[in-house]
Amino acid sequence: YKSLDEALTHGGIANNVKVNLVRIESDKLKKNEISKKLKSVSGILIPGGFGKRGTEGKISAIKYAREKKIPFFGICFGMQMAIIEFARHKLNIKNASSTELDKKCYPVIGLIHEWNKNGKVFKGTEKNLGGTMRLGLYTAKLKNNSAIKKIYKSNEIKERHRHRYEVNTNQRSKFEKKGLIFSGMSPDNKLPEIIELKNHPWFIGVQFHPEFKSRPLAP
């Protein structure tokens, strides 16, 4: 997470604050300890990752951030965990998860071919990853009047990606009716790149890795 640590430092410099990192091991985070562990933090960041280890702790932390109005930022896997948390607790889809974690789940996250049989989406061609890796610089179009558009001050952005799994767009209308907005989409409107929560001080998830492009004078 060196690039992530440096990006947080860059952001602190830009805002004239010192960023004090509190590292929490999500696989050791128990539900009855959430408040004790997180009540003193100013924000919660769930970074990229993979695999089942620690996912329930991450989901519990996201729920706490959403309900307690604590600023939250989810990057790549972190955004996917936010989708799962919202699906379980706001859409009442109790077995919502990712097919990366549970093949028998209700797939709010999955490989595109697992939930979208129509249309063609370029996914990369790395042979050792089965041709499913979405890798490199991709464009996202930003929703008008969204928090993310105010942050970037642009109609579209280009950010670096490295992931295989995507948000299931078949449930987009249900998420948005409950207040979770898909505020950044791929140019063909098929792939969610950014989500944000209405009526929350700062709750944003991104499928890309903004830390890869962060620089001291351009965080």
Positions of the model-derived regions?
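N-terminal beta1-alpha1 cap of cysteine-dependent amidohydrolase-like domains
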Residues: 1-199, 207-219
